[in-house]
Design a protein with these regions (language model features):
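Exposed acidic/Ser/Thr-rich ligand/metal-binding surfaces
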Residues: 1-162
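An acidic, Ser/Thr-enriched
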Residues: 160-208
Length: 208
């Protein structure tokens, strides 16, 4: 599945690949790669017995932090068919790391394979990372999932959009009913809405 993802990358895209089981392995550094050569590197991998999900994600974050293109979209795409059972395994702790990275401009999308992965954890990580959450049943579906993910990246028109809401003196209290992260600021609050895509409409909903 990862080999298919690599073939969807454009000529200007830089992609890195990290593999994780009980250990974490850098397969491809963050760079432009020949799709066939990169795919062969990925296809040579063999699965292990455990899932160090946090270690893999943190290594990917390290790759992105070393990038030298500040204007680039930075996204971790986490693929797994298992449960986090090595490294950081507490869901709230993992979510906090992903949310912190999102505040620094790194989004996280998650793709779970088959029926053995932790769907609740991946959904929480994708929400915290302002990314997408997918379920993938096999190679045929993987092509569509990856096309959706890369198509979304290509249509990003603004990153890390936030809206600041300030109420008038006549308003006793204000709130947001959406599940966007909210931060209090003097005189109101700031709503983090993630990346904005061309042609997309976003709504903020509050009580009346």
């Amino acid at each position: 599945a990862t080999a298919q993802l690599l073939r969807l990358a454009g000529p200007d895209d830089r992609v890195g690949v990290v593999a994780f089981d009980e250990d974490v392995q850098l397969v491809l550094p963050l760079s432009r790669h020949d799709p066939d050569t990169a795919a062969n590197e990925v296809l040579a991998l063999r699965s292990g017995g455990s899932t160090n999900m946090s270690g893999g994600w943190l290594k990917a974050l390290e790759l992105l932090a070393g990038g030298r293109r500040p204007e680039a979209l930075r996204r971790v795409i986490l693929l797994t068919d298992g449960h986090a059972n090595v490294g950081i395994t507490e869901p709230d702790e993992m979510v906090a790391f992903v949310r912190g990275a999102q505040a620094q401009g790194v989004t996280t999308s998650c793709i779970g394979f088959a029926d053995g992965y932790d769907e609740h954890l991946l959904a929480a990580l994708a929400d915290a990372g302002m990314g997408n959450d997918y379920w993938c049943d096999g190679p045929d579906q993987a092509t569509r999932v990856f096309a959706d993910e890369f198509g979304g990246l290509a249509s990003v028109v603004a990153q890390n959009v936030s809206v600041e809401v300030r109420s008038s003196a006549r308003v006793a209290a204000a709130a947001v009913l959406n599940e966007f992260p909210v931060t209090e600021v003097p005189g109101g609050f700031q709503v983090a809405m993630g990346d904005a895509y061309g042609g997309e409409r976003r709504k903020l909903v509050g009580p009346v």
